[in-house]
C-alpha cells in the first residue's frame, strides 16, 4: 500500500488533484494529506486490522450483487450460512458543502518540466436531481470530450495547454478544470479556461456542439450496458438512492430533453471556489 501511495504522489497530476481537494473541501475526511495517510497506514498492525474487519462484519451494511446465470436458491442458502445478523446500516454517498465567497488559492514549485493549473468550482446540484443531466451535458461541452471548448479553444486554437480537461463529481458537488501548461502561460490559461465556462453561462455554443455532446454521452451509456462493473455500480446506486437513480431508458429519455436553456441554468450555478498552481521548475 505504501509503495502504491508513493507512486501516486509521484504523479504530478495526482499530486495537483489532491492539493486542489485540500483547498476546495471543508470536510477533513476529503482533505487527507499524504503524510497523514502514510502515518495511518504505518500505525496499522495485524491486530488492529483484524479487529476492524470483525467490526465491519458484525455491524456495517453489506450489499451483495450477483450478475449472470446462477441459481437463486443456492445463492440464498450460501448467504444464510454466513450467519449474518440484522443490522441498521446507513450509507451516505452524497456530500454537500455550502459555497464560500472566499476564494482559496495555493501554489507550489516542483522540480518537474510541466506546470499544472487546477480550478475548482462549487456545484450545488446533487446526483439524481433535476440539474443532474444538464450538468453532465454542460461538463461534456466544457471539457469532457475531444470536441469540447477547453480542448478546441485553449489547447488546439490558442496552444496554451499540453493536456486539458474537466471532471464533474455530482456526489460531492465539485467541478474540476485542469491543464498542463508552460509556467509563463499561467494567467492567460487561467483566464481563457474560465472564459469557456462563461461562454456556456451565456449560451455561446451551437446546436451541433450540443448534439455532438449528447451523442457522446449516449454512446457512453450504451457501452456501460455491456460492462459488468457499470451494471453492478448502477444497481448499487439504485439500492442506495431508490427513485433518485433512473434506469437506462429513463436516462436516455431525459438526456433528449436537455436543451440550451437548461445548460445555461446549470452553468450559472457553477462558481469558482479554489485555484491551485504547481509551477514546474527544472
Label each PLM-derived region with a short phrase.
Residues 1-91, 126, 156-282:
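Charge-rich, well-structured scaffold segments of protease-associated domains
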Residues 61, 88-149:
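His/Glu-based metal-binding/catalytic segments typifying zinc-dependent metallopeptidases
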Residues 141-159, 171:
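M16/MPP (pitrilysin/insulinase) zinc-metallopeptidase core fold and M16-derived inactive scaffolds
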